């Protein structure tokens, strides 16, 4: 078992997240707030990636993705 997340895995999911964030828009104030939070976690991911803290980078990416999917499922973003 390894305790490291491969950099390539973080980059892969960050790229997918970037595409997703570029393709959605808010339908409400709640949706706009959700997107702002998702973008903040995306930015955190980039920061931790530069710092080579792959665990925190991946965690921030996952949080961002979860916010986007939740807002999408609630109909707050399209």
Model-derived regions: residue spans:
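Conserved small-residue packing positions in alpha-helical repeats and bundles
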Residues: 38, 43-45
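Short, charge-rich amphipathic alpha-helical segments embedded
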Residues: 65-78
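Amphipathic, heptad-repeat alpha-helical segments
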Residues: 1-35
């Amino acid at each position: 078992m390894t305790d490291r997340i491969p950099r390539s895995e973080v980059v892969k999911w960050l790229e997918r997240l970037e595409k997703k964030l570029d393709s959605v828009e808010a339908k409400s104030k709640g949706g706009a707030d959700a997107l702002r939070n998702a973008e903040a976690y995306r930015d955190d991911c980039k920061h931790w990636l530069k710092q080579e803290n792959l665990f925190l980078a991946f965690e921030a990416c996952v949080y961002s993705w979860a916010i986007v999917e939740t807002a999408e499922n609630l109909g707050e973003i399209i």
